[in-house]
């Protein structure tokens, strides 16, 4: 199975550096890394170029012009470049625990998509890691919040099989994985969602509508989220999402750019 790791980013190269550092030391190196870039400046391009020189797998850069928050289209651009059978998504402010890709590979199963959680880092720790260019963090590190999400205990995952079963839209796009063929069936991400919010819930909903089930990667696929101020949800995206909850494909998605 070939795995493509897609990392979303926008003008935060100091955080992307740590994400790429964590990708480089995975126990299971992805077969390729694709940066879904929503219009970053030249310093991000230079960072990616420098990492690509000695990275253990190919790094591809899917860049689009900066015309506001267009995460859905950015991810579709990255998918257009993907060669993997299985796609793992994170954001460019994520540090992956070293078993992250191996965990997602182990959890991959036909008929399912996988969502995980994340531990959060306080601002002071985030600034320290960025300044020192280090990724050595764990459950025990001071400044880690939501520590229950930093516990790597994969033998306990089966105990959480029914966790959040009734919460249809539980999950985060910063830690999700699915088969590429399933993404094609629903036409990828909905590019009509412009502005922050609902890209992931919309995708989950359409995956459910084609008959997929969800796995929850509790105690596996551990990741740490670097601190930043929260963005405001775009109310227009919410209205667009709620307008048709039964649809299986989006009108403007992956197909339009293939």
Where do the protein language model's features map onto the residues?
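A conserved acidic beta->alpha catalytic loop
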Residues: 29, 37-48, 68, 94
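Cell-envelope/extracellular polymer assembly enzymes that use nucleotide-activated donors
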Residues: 2-4, 32, 202
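Acidic helix N-cap motif at the loop->helix transition within catalytic regions
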Residues: 17, 42-50, 99
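Glycine-rich, basic loop-to-helix element that forms the pyrophosphate-binding segment
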Residues: 65-82, 99
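A short, conserved alpha-helix in the catalytic core of glycosyltransferases
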Residues: 171, 175-187, 194-213, 218
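Short aromatic/hydrophobic "clamp" motif used to bind/position activated sugar donors
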Residues: 87
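Conserved donor NDP-sugar-binding/catalytic core segment of glycosyltransferases
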Residues: 99-140
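Short, acidic, metal-binding catalytic loop of nucleotide-sugar glycosyltransferases
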Residues: 21-30
């Amino acid at each position: 199975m070939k795995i493509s790791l897609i990392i979303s980013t926008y003008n935060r190269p100091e955080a992307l550096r740590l994400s790429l550092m964590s990708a480089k030391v995975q126990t299971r190196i992805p077969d390729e890394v694709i940066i879904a870039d929503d219009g970053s400046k030249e310093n991000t391009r230079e960072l990616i170029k420098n990492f690509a020189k000695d990275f253990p797998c190919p790094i591809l850069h899917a860049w689009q012009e900066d015309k506001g928050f267009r995460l859905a289209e950015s991810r579709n651009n990255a998918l257009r470049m993907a060669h993997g059978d299985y796609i793992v998504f994170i954001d460019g402010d994520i540090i992956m625990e070293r078993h992250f890709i191996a965990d997602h590979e182990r959890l991959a199963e036909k008929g399912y998509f996988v969502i995980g959680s994340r531990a959060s880092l306080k601002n002071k720790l985030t600034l320290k890691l960025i300044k020192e260019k280090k990724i050595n963090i764990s459950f025990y590190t001071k400044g880690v919040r939501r520590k229950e999400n930093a516990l790597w205990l994969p033998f306990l995952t089966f105990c959480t099989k029914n966790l959040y079963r009734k919460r249809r839209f539980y999950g985060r796009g910063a830690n999700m994985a699915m088969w590429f063929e399933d993404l094609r069936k629903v036409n990828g991400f909905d590019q009509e969602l412009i502005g922050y919010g609902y890209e992931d819930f919309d995708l989950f909903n359409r995956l459910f509508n084609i008959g997929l089930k969800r796995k929850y990667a509790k105690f596996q696929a551990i990741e740490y989220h670097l601190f930043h101020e929260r963005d405001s949800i775009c109310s227009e995206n919410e209205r667009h999402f709620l307008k048709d909850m039964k649809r299986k494909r989006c009108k403007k998605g992956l197909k339009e750019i293939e």
